[in-house]
Amino acid sequence: MERYAIGIDLGGTSVKYAVVASSGKMPFSGQLPAFAQESAEAVLGQVLKGVEACREYAVSEGLMLAGVGVGTPGVVSADGRTVLGGAENIAGWENIPLAGRVEEAEGLKTLAGNDANMMALGETLFGAAKGATDVVFVTVGTGIGCGALMDGRLYRGYRNRGMEMGHITVKCDGEGCACGGVGCLEHYASTSALVRRFCELNGSARDAEVDGKDVVLFYKEGNPAAVQAMEEHWNYLAHGIASMINLFAPQRVVVGGGISEAGDFYLEKLREGVRRQMMSVCGEETELVAARLGNRAGCMGAAGLVLDKMG
């Protein structure tokens, strides 16, 4: 018998929402602007609109909902109730009683979790890591997020405060990062970093019209600045992934984010770099694959969390 839950994926630009079935089907979904630079209340309002749209659909179709799962940037309390902080892309997003606010407004039991963890769970339950018990999920975008499952369970660190792969040090004498650290992986290997580095090497000002897909296109055309920027990107990202393999020895590393969809050549170059840098005994059974769910992973993982805990 199919069971259903609402999955919300909150990001810096949008709020994605969906009704998700235990089989992985997604009969209803949508997206709203996040208003992330306005205020925490504005963001909460958009989350609630997404939940309400899903609830109305479920009522119209006669579907019973197990509850609501919300994937959010930042650190979430161990009980899945409160966003403690660490979401640099959402203004004022700290000490937010997220689960309580949704429950109060919609009358549905709610759990929150870190967005990368929810994506990792989504890919493990329904996507590229289905059937695996030990998985590392890496998302490469404006930042770098990471989630992991060990023995089939999300690994979050003590009180949900771990797995900030984007802020491991890859250059000990490197530049400062927005987190306050120095030489962070995110500062050198994110898509934002790739574009910034391309512009530096190309002798041009940072162009708002240039994005990661453009740099990939320039790389394919043989543009020297793009070639060097991409090689540096792969090297830094491989360093970070190899470190995760050495620590966790996962069955699969799933790489998501828009740039991971650049083509097979992108993943193959990354695999080459990872093989050079990892301990072979740690990664001899690790498969590095592209994410399969695209921008659905966060909603599907958040709903999957609720179906597991409340269904």
Language-model features: where?
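Glycine-rich beta-strand-to-loop/alpha-helix junction loops that act as flexible
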Residues: V68-G74, V255-I259, A291
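Short glycine-aspartate micro-motif
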Residues: A5-D9, L65-G69, V135-T139, G145, ...
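Short glycine-rich, Thr/Ser-proximal phosphate-binding strand/loop in the N-terminal lobe
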Residues: E2-K49, T82-G85, N160
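Glycine-rich phosphate-binding loop and adjoining helix at the ATP-binding site
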Residues: A36, A40-L48, E52, L63-V68, ...
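A mobile "lid/hinge" subdomain adjacent to the ATP/sugar-phosphate binding pocket shared
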Residues: V20, L185-V254, T286-E287
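Glycine-rich phosphate-binding/hydrolytic loop that grips phosphoryl groups
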Residues: V20, L111-T124, E261-G311
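Glycine-rich phosphate-binding loop of actin/hexokinase-like ATP-binding domains
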Residues: K130-Y188
